[in-house]
Amino acid sequence: MTSEIKKVGVIGAGTMGAGIAGQLANAGVEVVLLDLLNKETGNNRADEAIERMKNAKPTDAFNAGLMIPDNAKNITTGLSNENLDMLADCDWIIETILAPQEIRAGIYQNIEKIAKPDAIFSSNTST
């Protein structure tokens, strides 16, 4: 049995997480992108990542992600330490954060509490 991936949650808006979110948005998939506040700017890192992708040149491999800046409309942002509930209706949840295993384990436990039973969970980091 196959199921369609309609909504994907990405935790971590660094190079990998933002790039994954951008490519999914390019494909027309609804994306929730979560990260923490940037201590230097006070902005959500996920919002900053979207702005970088919208302004990136197609040849900029480290900031690429959105083929058309308007595809950013497919991405909703939130804070990973406050808005994990935004992942509750995601079909696929991808963790891409660089953090010690203990921190990621805590996030996994919290996701398990709110994720739908048939959600796919994957990690883009060493777990």
Locate each region found by the language model.
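Rossmann-like NAD(P)-binding element
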Residues: 36-48, 52-121
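A short beta-strand-to-loop transition that corresponds to the Sensor-1 phosphate-sensing loop
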Residues: 123-127
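NAD(P)+-binding Rossmann beta1-loop-alpha1 motif at the extreme N-terminus of oxidoreductases
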Residues: 1-55
